[in-house]
Every structure is written in C-alpha cells, then in structure tokens.
From Swiss-Prot:
Domain notes: Consists of a large core fragment in the N-terminal portion and a small headpiece (HP) in the C-terminal portion. The core fragment is necessary for both actin-nucleating and -severing activities, whereas the HP binds F-actin strongly in both the presence and absence of calcium and is necessary in actin-bundling activity. The Gelsolin-like 1 repeat is necessary for the actin-capping activity. The entire core fragment is necessary for the actin-severing activity.
Renumbered residue ranges of the record's region Core: 1-734
Protein name: Villin-1
UniProt subcellular location: Cytoplasm, Cytoskeleton; Cell projection, Lamellipodium; Cell projection, Ruffle; Cell projection, Microvillus
Domain HP: 761-827
Keywords of the record: Actin capping, Actin-binding, Apoptosis, Calcium, Cell projection, Cytoplasm, Cytoskeleton, Phosphoprotein, Repeat
Entry function: Epithelial cell-specific Ca(2+)-regulated actin-modifying protein that modulates the reorganization of microvillar actin filaments. Plays a role in the actin nucleation, actin filament bundle assembly, actin filament capping and severing. Binds phosphatidylinositol 4,5-bisphosphate (PIP2) and lysophosphatidic acid (LPA); binds LPA with higher affinity than PIP2. Binding to LPA increases its phosphorylation by SRC and inhibits all actin-modifying activities. Binding to PIP2 inhibits actin-capping and -severing activities but enhances actin-bundling activity.
Keyword Cytoplasm included in the entry's annotation: yes
Family: Belongs to the villin/gelsolin family.
Organism: Bos taurus
Phosphoserine modification, residue list: S366, S735
C-alpha cells in the first residue's frame, strides 16, 4: 500500500520558504538532489513541494508531475502521496496536477533558469543529473519566452524549425542554434539555459557556442560540427506559433456544486462569472471551470470526508465528461488555504480575523476608518515595504505645482484653489520630493466624473508632454474622482475638498449652489478629505461628520459613531469650505433650520458601520504584450526584480491600484498604450474589477518606494551593470578558434563521442589548492595530470586561484589559458 514514509515525513520542510522534489521510484518517494532541480525524465513522475512566505504567513503548494511515458501505477502513487502530504500539513496546501507539456505558470516559475525534460526514466536505469558527466548526446528544443521548457527531440535537422531555439549538447560542447525568426528574449533564455547546464552539470568545463540561424556563415566551424552530427542540412520547417490563450476564455467561469448525498456523484452548475465568495458553503465541495483551461476543486472544511478524498478523481471525471484534453491543469483548494490566483477569480475575497494593510482607497459609502499612523518620511525609502503598504513616498511636504485642463491646454491653478478639486474639471499635479538632494517626481492626473471626454483625453496627453519635459522621470498616477490615494490627500494637510461638479475657472458662468453638503472622512492630516454629496437628509450617516454650508451659516454635524480625531479633522477642513463661524450640531439635537436646508427630515444610514472587510491582497506581476494585435498578460509566480526585463512592460496588480512598469528598451507602442493596456486587463479580469482603479505608470530607473516595496530586496543599481544578449554571447568566446574542437568531433563518427575521447574526458580527482600550486611534477599527489592541474581543483579553489570562473577560463584562447596558468603557478 502506498503510504508516506516516516523518512519523508522527517525530511519534509514545513517552515522555510523553498522547494523540495521527490521522484517516484518503485512506488516510493526518493528525494532529488538540489543540483538536479529542473531536470525531469519523461518516463517518471515527481512530487514537488513549494513553500512561500508573504509577510508573516506561509503558504504551501504541492504538485505532482506526470511524464508522458510514465506508468499508470506511478501516476497513481504520485497522486496519493500528494494527498497524504496535504493531510500531513493539515489541509494547508494547494494541490496541483501537472502534465508534461502543459505545466502551469506556477510550476514553471520555480525553475527560473528553465526546465529540461530528458528521455527515459528510473525503469530504464536513468539517474538524475550527474555533475561532470560528459558522456552525453542530445538535442534540446527550447520553448517559452520566460520560464523555458527544453525537451529532448530526435537528433536530426528534421526536429528544427525557423522560429525556436535548439541546444545541441555534445558533452564538452553545447551549440545553441537560434532560429532566424526567434526573438531576442527566446535567444537570451536559451543562452541562460546553456550556461546553467554548463555550470551546474559540467562544473564549468564545457564550451558553449552560438549559431544565429539568419547568419550561419559567421559560424562555419560550429555548422560543420552540427552537419556532421545531425546529417546533411535540409529545408527547415516554418516557425510554429506559440499557443495564445484569449483573455475572454480566462474570464469564462462556471461554478459547479458536487454532491454524493444520493449515493452517486452529482455535479450541478450553480453560477457563472462574476462569482462571489458566499456561493461557497463550508459543508460542500465545488468545481470551478475556467474556460476549460484549468479546473479548480474547492473542498469545504465541513464537507463529507469521502467527497474530500475523491476530489481529484472528481476533477478528472469532470475533464473526461467535458471532453477536455487529459493534460488540463487541476488545482485542489482547501477551505481557508486558497491560493491568490483562486481568490482573485471572485469579485472580492475576505478572510476573517486577519488585519489588513493601511491606506486602501475607497469611495463614499464604502470608506474604511483608517487608524492614524505616525511615520518618518525618510523611512519610506529605507523601508520600501512600509511605503508600499501605506502607499506613501513621504509625508506630503514636498513642492507642488498644479494645472487645470482648460481649452485642452494647461492653465496654472490659482494658489487659493490648491486642494479644491471640481468634478467638472481635470487637473495635473506635479509633486517633487528629494532623496539625498536628488529630485523625484510624482505626476497626478485627476479626472473629474463630470469632465468632458475631450478634457479627460487632453489630461492624459498633457501628462505625456509634461513627463517629457522632466526627462521621462515622473511616476504618472491616474486618479479617477473618488479614488484619491493617501499621499495625494497628505499634500493638502487635511484640507482636500472634492466637489460633485462645477469648475474653478475664473470666467465660469456656472451657478454656485446655495446649499452644499460634504461628507468628511479621515483621522489625520495624511488621510482626510471632504467629499461633496447630495444636499438631502438621506445622505447623512451616523458614523461620520458632515459639513452643511448654506448662504447664512455653516453647520458641523457630528454623527454618534464618529471619533474625536474625525471631529477635529472635520473642523480643520470646514475652514476650507466656509469662512463663516461653524455651528456644531450633535446627531439628535439638530435645529429646525438644519433640516429645512436639507429639504426636510428623511431616513438615513444609522446602523453601526461594520469593521472594514479583511480583503486578502496578494500582489501579482504580469508580463504584458500587444504584439499579436490583442492584449495578453502572462503571470509571473514568485516574482522578484530579476523578472523585470528591460525590453518589456509589466503590470503589478495590488488590487486597489495597478502599477504599469516600462522597461527602457520597451516597444514604443506598448509604452504609449499604458492606460489602455491596464484598462483591458481590468475589463478581462475574472474577478469583475473596478474600472476606476488608480493606474500608476512607472519607468525603469525611477521606481518609487511604493512600487519597490512589493519586491524582496530591491537593488536600485541592478541595471547599471546588466548585460545584454550580445554581451553574454561575447563572454562565451564565440569569436574564438573552434578548430581544435571541430577537428576532434568531426574526426570520428557521431556515436563515438563519449567519455573515452580526449574532448569528453571525464572529471579528474579533486585536490586542495596548496598541493597543486608552484609544485614540481615529482611533488604532485598521485593521480594528478601535471598538464591539467587546474582541472583537479574544486570550483571554489579554481575561481580563487585563477581569478575567474571555470566557464570564463575555458572560453579563453588556448595561449591565454597557458599564460594565466604560468602566472598562477599551475603550469
């Protein structure tokens, strides 16, 4: 019987973020060494556990991977072990079924350098990767722009096509052949994979050569080797288009209720997109079908034990019934331990008894009471995580310039109107703050709900012009009326006023209302604003403070549920609304004139406001593209700064605001389409997102701490020393002389390339550095080849002795190698 062994339980990591992998061997879980992570056999099945840390919370994912040539018994064992591991973790894990060739983005994300799938398996005597083994011949087909998967294919030109990257691995030589229609990123990923094989599997003692398919004549010696090994070159196949998933398909959600209460399993459709969390009952199990792309099974914590146990089988039966491909991805979600991806398929997802971060943006009627927090502005940059959570780059004490869109042009706003935002206008506000005496800029684009479409368009256009005047350094923040972020409010020190309509233009003929009512929200100078509402009694709320301005007086109405801090901030902002003396009115003690000004008494919200819902917000990073003529967003799991490519644009979704990051070498069309791209993302989001979500445009090299704080260990100097594809290619020594290797390989038949040849000789025994440096031949330890002393060193000693890595050394011309060995006492 398949059962999780005590040895596996004892070695199971449950506290430290990271990955563990086991291979199914003779129906048992056998650990895979870390230097073999990312290498899989198509005849085997594997179990992978990943632990992630978000804040102080740990989350668990368990995947079982099915090789296309694996046996049914091995597949069944992997599935059972996955369930048992989840049981051992007390139901805290998300379970994933992965099938070769259709792995999830989450799975691929664990292997940033790429995945290599090899032929064979444990049944045919195949072992995991052995370091320094050169008895290898294989052709790898590299697929994928970001997290690549390289599978072994037939060693023949027939396997090639014009659009992909291929690695011909011959032990001590790896040739990367780039299809003439492959793109820059595919070539870079292929090169990184080739270097990974060289450094991890061969200890750096392998040459890597690159052939660009559009210019094969530039690499005659490498092409001679390829033709010798692969046979005579024939016409190449056309490029094969990558599979594109339509966003609409991702948003096509259907929820099914699963029950076996009648003695047989009954699956019944109960809802379609948009979905809400209250559709899920703790007593039952459910299947969520995402357009046939992925199947989720949600297991209620109080559901029937048998239903829980059969969850995976129910999903597989569902796939068969729907005639979906057998490789369809499956995820099992435990009640209370749902993944962020699953949660965001719903309109909103809340978790009881979990505190939330500060500084969410809200509209009137759903505004949360924000606890006052004292912070030092400089700490926002020392601790960007705090800045990201609070959405504050500083305390709002920087320099301010403000313009209004008038006749589609920028007109400076009179000083007396700073902090006043009229719903019939659009404004640009440039905020300047300094870090170590260097200026940084935020460009707010505030768009009134009653502004014309021409003015809204002009505000975006003028923002681009202003951005260019400041060398494209400002961070652009689109702010729809009612979505004002905390930092914008902090600039006006508790005196920000938002009017329903109207304008602050000097020549305006629009009449000013004789009676105005403002709802005040906020507890400090950093989070307070007054928002105009309809002047009638029904607009009141017992939890808040309101300002009622009439022609004769100004009332400050204090609801029974408001706090002392809220009353004090309301008094401050009331002076901005009206210069007249304020009459404080306590709820229940209103004078007759108060109700008269509001058109008479009427029912209003008087129940105690519920505590703010604990929305679960997990930041998600997406690579964006519109190169195919339609918007595509590819998620990057477990993201870090390295995932931000200079040639691309990315979208960072933190739910109540969305960042759009632009790499310095990004496509011009993608740069210009920032707002459109984010809007398209929000429209096609299966969670039914608010299209008025604030959009923040960030350029590479000018990231504010509110952005960098979502990344672990952000390095502001990372791109100063980054290397291009051309730089990496030059490092490989492709301009060198390949004649010796060419002669070695082409002097014998392809099948003779093995560890017995000079080129592919196996690893030599390792000795301490001090036993090899500056020693005459007779004093060398037994077994040392005097002419190859450097090959008897560990990688660490090699690097210390020669001042470079083995891979860099082997890329040097032979004469340079010899001179360096003489200089370092290894000749």
């Amino acid at each position: 019987m398949t059962k999780l062994s005590a040895q596996v339980k004892g070695s199971l990591n449950i506290t430290t973020p990271g990955v563990q992998i086991w291979r199914i061997e003779a129906m048992q879980m056998v650990p895979v060494p870390s230097n073999s992570f990312g290498s899989f056999f198509d005849g085997d099945c594997y179990v992978i556990q990943a632990i992630h840390k978000t804040g102080s919370n740990l989350s668990y994912d368990i995947h079982y991977w099915i090789g296309q040539a694996s046996s049914q018994d091995e597949q069944g064992a992997a599935a059972i072990y996955t369930t048992q591991m989840d049981d051992f973790l007390k139901g805290r894990a998300v379970q994933h079924r992965e099938v070769q060739g259709n792995e999830s983005d989450t799975f691929r994300g664990y292997f940033k350098k790429g995945i290599v799938i090899r032929k064979g398996g444990v049944a045919s005597g195949m072992k995991q990767v052995e370091t320094n083994s050169y008895d290898i011949q294989r052709l790898l087909h590299v697929k994928g722009k970001r997290n690549v998967v390289a599978g072994e294919v037939e060693m023949s030109w027939k396997s090639f096509n014009r659009g992909d990257v291929f690695l011909l691995d011959l032990g001590k030589l790896i040739i990367q052949w780039n299809g003439p229609e492959s793109n820059h990123m595919e070539r870079l990923r292929g090169m990184n994979l080739a270097k990974e094989i060289r450094d991890q599997e061969r200890g750096g003692r392998t040459y890597v050569g690159v052939v660009d398919g559009e210019d094969e004549k530039a690499s005659p010696q490498l092409m001679e080797i390829m033709n010798h090994v692969l046979g005579q070159r024939k016409e190449l196949k056309a490029a094969v288009a990558d599979t594109v998933v339509e966003p609409a398909l991702k948003a096509a959600l259907k929820l099914y209720h699963v029950s076996d209460s009648e003695g047989k399993v009954v699956v019944r459709e109960i809802a379609t997109q948009p979905l809400t969390q209250d559709l899920l009952s703790h007593e039952d199990c459910y299947i969520l079908d995402q357009g046939g792309l992925k199947i989720y099974v949600w297991k209620g914590k109080n559901a029937n034990a048998q239903e829980k146990k059969e969850a995976m089988n129910q999903a597989l039966n569902f796939i068969k019934a729907k005639q979906y491909p057998p490789s369809t991805q499956v995820e099992l979600q435990n009640d209370g331990a749902e993944s962020a991806v699953f949660q965001q398929l719903f309109q909103k997802w809340t978790v009881p008894n979990r505190t939330t971060g500060l500084g969410k943006t809200h509209t009137v009627g759903s505004v949360a009471k924000v606890e006052q927090v004292k912070f030092d502005a400089m700490s926002m940059h020392v601790q960007p995580q705090v800045a990201a959570q609070q959405k504050m780059v500083d305390d709002g004490s920087g320099e301010v310039q403000m313009w209004r869109i008038e006749n589609l042009e920028l007109v400076p706003v009179n000083t007396k109107w700073l902090g006043h935002f009229f719903g019939g206008d659009c404004y640009l506000l440039l905020y300047t703050y300094f870090i170590n005496e260097k200026p940084h800029y935020l460009l707010y684009i505030w768009q009134g709900s009653q502004a014309s479409q021409d003015e809204i368009t002009a505000s975006a256009y003028q923002a681009v012009i202003l951005d260019q005047e400041y060398n494209n350094e400002p961070v652009q923040i689109r702010v729809p009326m009612g979505k004002e972020p905390p930092h914008l409010m902090s600039i006006f020190k508790g005196c920000m006023v938002v009017y329903q309509g109207g304008t602050s233009r000097a020549n305006s003929v629009e009449p000013v209302p004789s009676t105005r009512l403002f709802q005040v929200r906020g507890t400090s100078a950093n989070n307070t604003k007054a928002f105009e509402v309809s002047p009638r009694a029904a607009s009141l709320n017992s939890n808040d403070v309101f300002i009622l301005k009439t022609q004769s007086c100004c009332y400050l109405w204090c609801g029974k549920g408001c706090s002392g801090d809220e009353r004090e901030m309301a008094k401050m902002v009331a002076d901005t609304v009206s210069r007249t003396e304020k009459q404080v009115v306590v709820e229940g003690q209103e004078p007759a004139n108060f109700w008269l000004a509001l058109g008479g008494k009427a029912p209003y919200a008087s129940t105690k406001r519920l505590q703010e819902e604990n929305l679960v917000i997990t930041p998600r990073l997406f690579e964006c593209s519109n190169q195919t003529g339609r918007f595509l967003a590819t998620e990057i799991p477990d993201f870090n700064q390295d995932d931000l490519e200079e040639d691309d644009v990315f979208l960072l979704d933190v739910w109540d605001q969305v960042f759009f990051w632009i790499g310095k070498n990004a496509n011009e069309d993608e740069k210009k389409a920032a707002a459109t791209t984010v809007q398209e993302y929000l429209k096609t989001h299966p969670g039914g997102r608010d299209l008025e979500t604030p959009i923040i445009v960030v350029k590479q090299g000018h990231e504010p701490p509110t952005f960098t704080g979502w990344f672990l260990a952000w390095d502001p100097f990372k791109w100063n020393n980054s290397k291009s594809y051309e730089d990496l290619k030059a490092e490989l020594g492709n301009s060198g002389d390949w004649s010796q290797i060419t002669a070695e390989l082409t002097s014998s038949k392809p099948e003779a390339f093995n560890a017995n040849s000079n080129l592919s000789s196996g690893p030599l025994p390792i000795f301490p550095l001090e036993q090899l440096v500056n020693k005459p031949t007779e004093e060398l330890p037994e077994g040392v080849d005097p002419s190859r002393r450097e090959e008897h060193l560990s990688i660490e000693d090699f690097t210390r002795a020669l001042g470079m890595t083995p891979s860099a050394f082997w890329a040097l011309p032979r004469w340079k190698q010899q001179n360096l060995k003489k200089e370092k006492g290894l000749f």
